[in-house]
């Protein structure tokens, strides 16, 4: 950003079936890193390698096409519309082509319910408004949506912030469920070390745009 270097020498590895926690206080560089990995910002130096191939992101679509899905704090959900409509949100299944296609509502309902069940949330009514769901359920909806639409790397931006303790535990259980699928790498952005310790396999600590520590879960035991 001009003469200011937001991230300097930051390096991290992520692997399918693992949670890599990225920790740091406000201003540490977590937001800049997540926006770079998700294509909002373009890196001015360094490299991003996905499945052995170097990639360059000029837009969020580039990152999405490479299999990187990001769930931000605001979740990009419409509280007044249904679970199913939020799950597909612009990528609805339709009969026919053009602006007058009919929505395949039953198929979309079935997919939304099944995908959320895979990671631990059972929805009895996919037509319920998202605003009636708990914060933890809304997080699960956003995560399930990212996975269904091809995320191989799932970036979670402060997923437990602004939630009550019970809802925080719901979200942590969801993260463990995704981890157990075995084929998705998870980057958990958080400032809550307790939550990170409950789910993460690897840790990277940031301060003022630089890595000040890293290690495996077993390194932090005790």
Go through the PLM ranges and name each one.
Residues 1-222:
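Glycine-rich phosphate-binding loops of nucleotide-dependent enzymes
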């Amino acid at each position: 950003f001009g003469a200011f270097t937001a991230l300097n020498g930051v390096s991290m590895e992520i692997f399918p079936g693992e949670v890599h926690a990225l920790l740091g206080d406000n201003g540490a560089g977590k937001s800049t890193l997540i926006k770079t990995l998700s294509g909002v910002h373009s890196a001015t130096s360094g490299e991003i390698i996905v499945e052995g191939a170097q990639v360059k992101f000029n837009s969020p679509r580039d990152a999405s096409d490479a299999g990187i899905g990001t769930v931000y704090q605001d979740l990009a959900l419409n509280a007044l519309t249904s679970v199913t409509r939020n799950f597909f949100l612009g990528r609805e299944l339709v009969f026919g082509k053009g602006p007058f296609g009919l929505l395949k509502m039953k198929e979309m309902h079935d997919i939304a319910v099944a995908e959320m069940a895979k990671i631990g949330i059972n929805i009895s009514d996919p037509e319920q408004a998202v605003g009636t769901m708990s914060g933890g359920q809304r997080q699960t909806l956003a995560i399930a949506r990212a996975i269904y639409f091809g995320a191989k790397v799932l970036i979670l931006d402060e997923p437990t912030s602004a939630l009550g303790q019970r809802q925080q535990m719901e979200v942590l259980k969801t993260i463990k469920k995704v981890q157990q699928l075995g084929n998705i790498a998870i980057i958990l952005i958080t400032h809550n070390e307790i939550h990170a310790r409950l789910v993460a396999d690897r840790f990277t600590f940031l301060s003022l745009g630089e890595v000040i520590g890293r290690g495996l879960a077993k390194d932090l035991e005790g």
